[in-house]
Amino acid sequence: MAKSMTSNARKKDTREKIELGGLIVKAGLRYEKRALLLGLLVDGGRRLKGDEEERSRLTAIGAEAFGHDDE
C-alpha cells in the first residue's frame, strides 16, 4: 500500500513537472538557458511579493496566452 502511494505521488510530481515545462515552451522560451529561466522565475517571484497590481497584470498576460491555445 505504501509503495502504491509513493508511486502515485511520484507520478503526480512527474506530471506537474511536465506541465510546468509546457509553460516554458508556450511562453516561447524553450531554447533559453536554464540559468536565464530560473532567473526570470526568481525575479518574478520577488516582484509578486506584496504587489497585487503586478500579480494581476501578469495573470492577465497569462490568461490571454492560454486563450490563444486554439491557434
Curated annotation (Swiss-Prot):
Which InterPro entries does the record match to this protein? Conjugal_tfr_TraD_a-type
Q: What is this protein called?
A: Conjugal transfer protein TraD
Source organism (scientific name) = Agrobacterium fabrum (strain C58 / ATCC 33970) (Agrobacterium tumefaciens (strain C58))
Q: Which Pfam families does this chain map to? A: TraD
Keywords of the record, alphabetical order, are: Conjugation, Plasmid
- Family membership noted in the UniProt record: Belongs to the TraD family.
Q: What are the leading ranks of the lineage?
A: Bacteria, Pseudomonadati, Pseudomonadota, Alphaproteobacteria, Hyphomicrobiales
